[in-house]
């Protein structure tokens, strides 16, 4: 069952301006080390950051909190699976919120789609609760996004 949905669009030019104006202060405030390494190594650096920024906004909406109630930027890290598919690594308040959203007897699955076409970057996040009989036997802290 779907327990959360979020979507966001980001103007890449806005991220270009933030990178030029604030540099590392901006990237260190909003992005994880993994995200910074990935984006800084790309020719389309600003577009890469913009997709991740939109993904974080969409994730915070799917969690039902926005960027408040203990959910912070760097607690929602966009990571890529070996196949290249983007997904999230959630920590701190974001992970706690995911645990609280997930019904007993279920495990969470977070789905992420990101794209860009200058000057726009867009992200969609769906949080799904999958039935899992083993989830009844596990303490809540074993959930991983």
UniProtKB/Swiss-Prot annotation:
EC class (word): transferase
Protein name (record): Holo-[acyl-carrier-protein] synthase
One GO cellular component term: cytoplasm
CC cofactor: Mg(2+)
Compartment annotation: Cytoplasm
Reaction catalysis annotation: apo-[ACP] + CoA = holo-[ACP] + adenosine 3',5'-bisphosphate + H(+)
Pfam families tied to this protein: ACPS (PF01648)
Gene3D superfamilies: 4'-phosphopantetheinyl transferase domain
Originating species: Methylocella silvestris (strain DSM 15510 / CIP 108128 / LMG 27833 / NCIMB 13906 / BL2)
EC annotation from Swiss-Prot or TrEMBL: 2.7.8.7
GO biological process terms on file: fatty acid biosynthetic process
Chain positions recorded as Mg(2+) binding sites: 8, 57
This protein's UniProt keywords: Cytoplasm, Fatty acid biosynthesis, Fatty acid metabolism, Lipid biosynthesis, Lipid metabolism, Magnesium, Metal-binding, Transferase
